[in-house]
Regions:
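His/Asp/Glu-rich mid-to-C-terminal helical/loop segments that flank catalytic regions of hydrolases
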Residues: 31, 35, 66-88
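Active-site lining segments that contact anionic ligands and/or coordinate catalytic metals
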Residues: 11, 32-34, 55-57, 153-156, ...
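Class II aminoacyl-tRNA synthetase-like tRNA-binding/catalytic domains
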Residues: 1-57, 61-65, 247
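A generic structural motif
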Residues: 59-70, 189-192
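Active-site pocket scaffolds in enzymes
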Residues: 196-197, 202-270
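Short conserved micro-motifs at the rims of enzyme active sites and ligand-binding pockets
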Residues: 27-28, 47-50, 69-72, 169-172, ...
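Metal-assisted phosphate- and nucleotidyl-transfer catalytic regions
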Residues: 1-4, 77-188, 211-233
Length: 270
C-alpha cells in the first residue's frame, strides 16, 4: 500500500522493491517453502516513531497449506521460539539494556482476536469511538497488547479477520462472513508482521485485480499471472519487520533507535 521510489534503469523506469511478495508467490509452487531476509523500500511520507523508508524484512511464503490457521500458527510459533532463544542466550545483554520481562502464552499459542472484537472491546473499555474500522488505530494496537499481557500473560497477540473493504487484490476472501484471511501479529503495542492467506485461483485473481483497477494485461503482471494460470497451491506467508522486533524486544520507543543509519523523510545520509 505504500508509495514506491522510482529510478532510471537503462532508459526504463524501475522502482525499488516494497516487498518480494510476487516473487515468493511465483516460487512457492516449485519450492513449497520460501524464505528471504532483505531490505524493502517504502516512500511513506510518515514522520513517526513507527515508520522508515528503508526497512529490513524477513519474508516467508508457505505452499500446500491446509488453511490460514496453519500460516498463523507457523509464524506465531516461529516468533515465540525466536523470543525464547533471544531471552535465554542473551539474558545478560538484555538486562544491561533494561529490556522488559518477556511474557509468552502458557499454552504456547499466540492469542487471537478478530479486528471487530478488538474494536468492540476497545470502545467499551475506553469510551472512544473508532471511525475507520478497516484497520486498527495505533491506540487500539497498544490497548489490545496491554490487555493480552495483563489478562493472558502474552506479549504477542493476533488481530485477525479484517473486513472485506480492507482487502488487497491478492488476499483470499471469506465471502460468507465478509472478512479477509489476514492477520496482523502485534508485539508490545506494535504490528511486527502481516500474515495473510493468498488467493491462488487464476480466475478469481484476475477478477480481483480488475476490481482494484489494475490492468491485467500490463507487462509487469505477465509472469505473475502466468504462475497462477499454470497452477499455484493454497499458500500464505508473512512480511516480518526485523527492525520493529529489535525495537520492542529491547524496549525502545522509536524504531529508528533500533536501526543503524535509519532512512526516513528527513534523513538520507549517513
Amino acid at each position: 500500500g505504500a508509495e514506491v521510489f522510482k529510478l532510471d534503469y537503462f532508459d526504463k523506469t524501475a522502482t525499488l522493491a516494497q516487498s518480494p511478495q510476487f516473487y515468493k508467490q511465483i516460487m512457492v509452487g516449485a519450492y513449497e517453502r520460501v524464505f528471504e531476509i532483505a531490505a524493502a523500500y517504502r516512500a511513506e511520507p510518515s514522520a513517526t516513531t513507527r515508520h522508515m523508508s528503508e526497512v529490513m524484512m524477513l519474508d516467508i511464503e508457505m505452499g500446500f497449506v491446509s488453511g490460514h490457521d496453519e500460516v498463523l500458527d507457523t509464524v506465531g510459533d516461529m516468533t515465540i521460539d525466536t523470543l525464547n532463544r533471544i531471552y535465554t542466550d542473551h539474558a545478560d545483554d538484555l538486562k544491561s539494556l533494561n529490556a522488559p520481562e518477556l511474557k509468552l502464552p502458557s499454552d504456547g499459542k499466540v492469542p487471537r482476536f478478530t479486528i471487530a472484537k478488538i474494536h468492540e472491546m476497545y470502545e467499551a473499555a475506553t469510551k472512544n469511538t473508532v471511525q475507520d474500522k478497516k484497520d486498527l488505530t495505533p491506540d487500539e494496537e497498544k490497548w489490545i497488547c496491554e490487555y493480552a499481557r495483563k489478562e493472558l500473560g502474552s506479549d504477542l497477540v493476533y488481530a485477525t479477520d479484517f473486513p472485506l473493504e480492507a482487502a488487497k487484490f491478492y488476499h483470499k476472501r471469506n465471502t460468507e462472513n465478509g472478512t479477509v484471511y489476514w492477520g496482523d501479529l502485534l508485539f508490545r503495542g506494535l504490528e511486527i508482521a502481516t500474515v495473510p492467506l493468498r488467493e491462488n485461483n487464476y480466475q478469481k485473481m484476475v477478477e480481483q485485480m480488475k476490481e482494484a483497477g489494475l490492468d491485467v494485461d500490463h507487462e509487469g503482471f505477465k509472469y505473475y499471472l502466468q504462475a497462477f494460470k499454470y497452477g499455484l497451491p493454497e499458500h500464505g506467508g508473512c512480511g516480518f519487520g526485523i527492525d520493529r522486533l529489535v525495537e520492542k524486544t529491547i524496549g525502545l520507543s522509536n524504531v529508528k533507535e533500533a536501526t543503524l543509519f535509519p532512512r526516513d523523510i528527513n534523513r538520507l545520509t549517513p
